[in-house]
Amino acid sequence: MGRKWANIKEKKASKDKTNSRIYAKFGIEIYVAAKSGDPDPHSNQKLRFVIERAKTYNVPKHIIDRAIEKAKGTGDETYSELRYEGFGPNGSMIIVDALTNNVNRTASDVRAAYSKNGGNMGVSGSVAYMFDNTAIFGVEGKDADELLELLMEADIDVRDILDEDGQAIIYAEPEDFHKVQEGLKAAGIEEFTVAEIEMIPQNDIQLSGEDLEKFEKLIDALEDLEDVQKVYHNVELED
């Protein structure tokens, strides 16, 4: 395991600071998931996953419901899922996931954010191979040993379980996200502090001085883009 959640979450802090931005991004993601299949989360696994994630960010129920109702309507707005890979200062690697109804606009915006802030766009696969796609769950009130026992009883294998920051963090294969979550719920665990699929860097680097300043400006510029849903990188940030 290249990264612990206690460190990964520091990378998320700048994006997570603005509730209105989080709500808007989840509104689009929920709409797309509901539009791609049945708008009922009980029968639409993709939609159920997005809603579970939204709950860990405290997205209000009315925003979730509004996005689902919009998907039930006659609108035919089409969104594409895109991934951009690139490089920042001094060996830093960045992955940008976007959800857009205008591919050309998004590509131009992401490219401009890189070029104006000391970064460079890479080709597909130039960065992603240095990250591990990972399902992550956070549970309070139980320790790693207790969760391991629960999962073993349910015959569910995971990569690792660690006690971090006053909670137990489960790392699993991304394709096992729903199996792990349903197994935990069957054991009586209904609330999660984290329920995500993340790209975790295999190795982190440290930046300082001007390189760190440039990097933080680049990440801010990418996260501020309307179509960007997630930004992953391999830089260790201070608390």
From Swiss-Prot:
Keywords of the record: Cytoplasm, DNA-binding, Transcription, Transcription regulation
Main location: cytoplasm
Any one of the GO BP annotations: regulation of DNA-templated transcription
Molecular-function GO terms, alphabetical: DNA binding
Gene3D superfamilies: 1.10.10.200, 3.30.70.980
Record's GO cellular component terms: cytosol
Similarity annotation: Belongs to the TACO1 family. YeeN subfamily.
Descriptive protein name: Probable transcriptional regulatory protein lin0388
